[in-house]
Amino acid sequence: MIELKTLLDLPLHFLHLKQIHCLLLTSPIFYTRRDLFLSRLLRRCCTAATQFRYARRLLCQLQTLSIQLWDSLIGHFSGGITLNRRLSFLAYRHMRRNGVIPSRHTFPPLLKAVFKLRDSNPFQFHAHIVKFGLDSDPFVRNSLISGYSSSGLFDFASRLFDGAEDKDVVTWTAMIDGFVRNGSASEAMVYFVEMKKTGVAANEMTVVSVLKAAGKVEDVRFGRSVHGLYLETGRVKCDVFIGSSLVDMYGKCSCYDDAQKVFDEMPSRNVVTWTALIAGYVQSRCFDKGMLVFEEMLKSDVAPNEKTLSSVLSACAHVGALHRGRRVHCYMIKNSIEINTTAGTTLIDLYVKCGCLEEAILVFERLHEKNVYTWTAMINGFAAHGYARDAFDLFYTMLSSHVSPNEVTFMAVLSACAHGGLVEEGRRLFLSMKGRFNMEPKADHYACMVDLFGRKGLLEEAKALIERMPMEPTNVVWGALFGSCLLHKDYELGKYAASRVIKLQPSHSGRYTLLANLYSESQNWDEVARVRKQMKDQQVVKSPGFSWIEVKGKLCEFIAFDDKKPLESDDLYKTLDTVGVQMRLPDELEDVTAES
């Protein structure tokens, strides 16, 4: 019997488990403790569909288990894969058929399983809880509140919460965490303040949940107050759990110096901590710092997860760091890390922005799963590279794959139509947003249509569309019209569009520069001088733009006519000269062809 108990703890093949089952049924020495061994066997037979069916038959053979063993079985099944969770429901049903009364430990794991599955009915178990008089038990009640709130069923959660006379920290945390999970971060913060007023001390779970809330609404002041409350408990240095949440909160609030300070003071860090710091730098547009932290992470022998890699790839895409992005891609392949939809979409975006359309297509085709963001990234890639018809065709391939477009998808495909001169196709797509997809076009979609009409010289139609807009035209809409007027030398309409843009953005130097360019195109130098004077009178300062360039895997930042002399300046300017030659080459070839 001892040998059999030891045998059941070993990693066994399913066939061996069935052989042990036969032994239990046929050998008389196991008769008195057969149910105990069957329950242990049952824990091992539920990792695949075939084993699930076998496990159901095993359940039916159990007859004399105590409530403690039933609770143990249900708890084991409820925390596993989907099939296991369904097995926990069957175990409960069989337990009741055998006349066993559930305990306060029976329902919390069942509730955890039912709320995770989403397609199951939690109210049936709630009714059983009331039937057996366990609804007033704090342990069971907190599980109900946690389940209802995490599923967004706040009416039911609030009724239980308001009816509870002895609200402990678990009760409060269940509500706070539920609000955070369902996008009501502000409500979570209100509940936290109320909890503090009642004198209930927060635990680590409460602090983590409320820090998430502060990060989501980017309320660094509130986040700092929570940080202060945590320090008041006498914990000078944060553990991994709290520290990672603090780094994440400060990062989302763009306070990357605070995030770095917390990170540096932590005695130990895990992949979540490193990822939070990297994501914070990327969100704050400190892309180079984010990539440097990633390199430090690898040197510290901390293996990145999918979220880490997606953040780093996003940083590479923003600054066009193709070499670094390829290294990350190679790291994923070398370490057999499956490229999920998030990482795949970011990779496509990186290769598209760096001019490597073929590599983007390769990543797209190799993805096992594609969501709307993946399709949109690829459509946008074709559009950005001038393959308007391919972008248009891919959009309809996406629809035939039963993936519904979102607002960004329409932005991408309408932009493709604008760049490809597909006026009628763009017009049909724009009308289909409301007619077929029940989606109200936003100002950015109108801007795409204005750009589409304007590029084809249909300036009056573009202006008429602006006048019919159900919302106030934005600077992007007027900017699209202005660009088209400049292209087709319609200076009168261009002046009107420019005046509307300047009215919306009176402190934006670029708008005045565009208007001055329009006047210089028409050789109206008096108006050019007037615009320059207007900028000076209104103290509009033209801030120099800056760019990044990757040289030998190192990212360099520079502005126009930069006279700084970094160590790598020679390599940097050689690279820029090469880029300049390549940009001029098509025009020079065209001139030679025309002359010949």
Curated annotation (Swiss-Prot):
Gene name for this UniProt entry: PCMP-E42
Coiled-coil regions, chain positions: none
GO biological process, one term: RNA modification
PROSITE patterns linked: PPR
Family (UniProt): Belongs to the PPR family. PCMP-E subfamily.
Disulphide bridges, residue numbers: none
PPR repeat ranges, renumbered to this chain: 66-102, 103-136, 137-167, 168-202, 203-237, 239-269, 270-304, 305-339, 340-370, 371-405, 406-436, 442-472
Gene3D superfamilies xref list: Tetratricopeptide repeat domain
Region (Type E motif): 477-552
Entry keyword set: Repeat
UniProt-recorded name of the protein: Pentatricopeptide repeat-containing protein At1g50270
Region named Type E(+) motif: 553-584
Pfam family, any one: PPR_2
UniProt GO molecular function: RNA binding
